[in-house]
Curated annotation (Swiss-Prot):
<dbReference type="GO" id="GO:0050660">
    <property type="term" value="F:flavin adenine dinucleotide binding"/>
</dbReference>
<feature type="binding site">
    <location>
        <begin position="78"/>
        <end position="80"/>
    </location>
    <ligand>
        <name>FMN</name>
    </ligand>
</feature>
<dbReference type="GO" id="GO:0050136">
    <property type="term" value="F:NADH:ubiquinone reductase (non-electrogenic) activity"/>
</dbReference>
<dbReference type="Pfam" id="PF03358">
    <property type="entry name" value="FMN_red"/>
</dbReference>
<dbReference type="InterPro" id="IPR005025">
    <property type="entry name" value="FMN_Rdtase-like_dom"/>
</dbReference>
<feature type="binding site">
    <location>
        <begin position="113"/>
        <end position="119"/>
    </location>
    <ligand>
        <name>FMN</name>
    </ligand>
</feature>
<comment type="similarity">
    <text>Belongs to the WrbA family.</text>
</comment>
<keyword id="KW-0285">Flavoprotein</keyword>
<keyword id="KW-0288">FMN</keyword>
<keyword id="KW-0520">NAD</keyword>
<dbReference type="GO" id="GO:0016020">
    <property type="term" value="C:membrane"/>
</dbReference>
<feature type="binding site">
    <location>
        <position position="134"/>
    </location>
    <ligand>
        <name>FMN</name>
    </ligand>
</feature>
<dbReference type="GO" id="GO:0050661">
    <property type="term" value="F:NADP binding"/>
</dbReference>
<feature type="domain" description="Flavodoxin-like">
    <location>
        <begin position="4"/>
        <end position="190"/>
    </location>
</feature>
<dbReference type="InterPro" id="IPR037513">
    <property type="entry name" value="NQO"/>
</dbReference>
<feature type="binding site">
    <location>
        <position position="12"/>
    </location>
    <ligand>
        <name>NAD(+)</name>
    </ligand>
</feature>
<keyword id="KW-0521">NADP</keyword>
């Protein structure tokens, strides 16, 4: 049975919802799953003034936690076409794990969100995936077995590189059922791959 970590940063709850969907998909494949978030770097007064969702159920992750899992799925919103500073800061602290090769051979994946359809989701996924490849991980994206990314009848996220959602400029659009289904599908694929590789 694979042990999967869904590691995320979510300012307004969109990525939190996607993280829980990824976790649900991994559990459907029989994995043991933990959902953890990275620490907020924005001062609390500023976060409250900007209506950040600070009451998230997931516990805070510690960098050394990463070595305990067969698979790690990383999610964060887009910040100017790249991952958030909160997630980048957390991953930057994993140099010791990198130096020891502690993440070699683990399965990795990425998911993201943006305000608009062309708001940098794919480049954000690439920024996450680049980190995971440097750690020596095997990447699993959102393959075209998920038919929900093939249609054009609705506005929807999703790319072969990972599940995504579109939040709208004011954050008013929650992840759609299709986007959540994509996240569940990717979570299941990652858990199944980890089980094959790690038994």
């Amino acid at each position: 049975m694979a042990k999967v970590l869904v590691l995320y940063y979510s300012a307004y709850g969109h990525i939190e919802a996607m993280a829980n969907a990824v976790a649900d998909g991994a559990r459907q494949a029989g994995a043991t799953v933990d959902v953890k978030r990275v620490p907020e770097l924005v001062p609390e007064a500023v976060a409250k003034a900007k209506y950040f969702k600070l009451d998230q159920a997931a516990p805070l992750a510690k960098v050394d936690d990463l070595a305990d899992y067969d698979a790690i799925v990383v999610g964060t919103g887009t910040r100017f076409g790249r991952m958030s500073s909160q997630m980048a800061s957390f991953l930057d602290q994993a140099g010791g794990l990198w130096a020891r090769g502690a993440l070699h051979g683990k399965v990795g994946g990425a998911f993201s969100s943006s305000a608009t359809q062309h708001g940098g989701q794919e480049t954000t996924l690439f920024s996450i995936i680049t980190n995971l490849l440097h750690f020596g991980m095997t990447i699993v994206g959102l393959n075209y077995g998920f038919a929900g990314q093939m249609g054009v009848k609705e506005v929807t996220g999703g790319a072969p590189y990972g599940a995504t959602t579109i939040a709208d400029g004011d954050g008013s659009r929650p992840p759609s059922e299709n986007e959540l289904a994509g996240a569940r599908y990717q979570g299941r694929m990652i858990a199944e791959t980890a089980a094959k590789l790690h038994g």
